[in-house]
Amino acid sequence: LRHFGPTMAHEIVMLGTGNAFLPNGRHHSFAIFDGKHIIDAPPTALISLRENGIKVSEISTIFITHLHGDHIFGLPFLLLERTYISDRELSQPLTIVAAPGARKRIEELCEIAYPGSMKKILSTIVWNEKAQGSTKDGWNWNRFEVNHNEFVDPFGYSFESTDGAKFVHSGDSGPCEPLYS
């Protein structure tokens, strides 16, 4: 991922465009923007990042759209890799942005996957459950409800950079008003 000159050229890379069933061998739905912010962490996240030459330690923000397995079951592997391979000192800050209540479920998922192995990294993560905020590099974001299974707290995100770049990620939404406004 590259940034050019004094004005940054933003880049969004779709690291996966499949659904829960991986049609035609496509990786699960997964995106990265500006080389350091990922949207969701599916089971195929680690391989998608490696295939694209992206180091797990360079990820600074993980935005979670909802709590279905095809969107979060890669989190234990990403955090484990970061702990034991790419950021052993846990010196690179990591923020996870998710709906209220998601932290508890994500921590439970990590404990089930690797009991006791991720307590340290989980304690260093900055958890953000607010409906809006900003990244350190100038992306303002807003989380909004979308049309999907209510039991998994489904949300989309709108993003706007301080230089005016904008995009929306809908998660697994069907048509709904927030996507058009």
Write out the residue ranges for each language-model feature.
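Short, Lys/Arg-enriched N-terminal segments with co-localized hydrophobic residues
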Residues: 1-7
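Conserved beta-strand hairpin/beta-sheet module of binuclear metal-dependent hydrolase folds
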Residues: 8-52, 153-171
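Short Pro/Gly-enriched beta-strand edge/turn motifs at strand-loop
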Residues: 9-17, 110-112, 137-142
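Active-site metal-binding loops of divalent metal-dependent hydrolases
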Residues: 17-19, 36, 67, 101, ...
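Metal-dependent phosphodiesterase/nuclease catalytic metal-binding core
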Residues: 32, 125-181
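Active-site metal-binding motif and surrounding structural segment of the metallo-beta-lactamase
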Residues: 46-95
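Structured loop/turn residues at beta-strand edges in well-structured enzyme cores
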Residues: 54-57, 92, 120-123, 137-139, ...
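Acidic/polar short surface loop at catalytic or gating sites that assists cofactor/ion binding
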Residues: 87-125
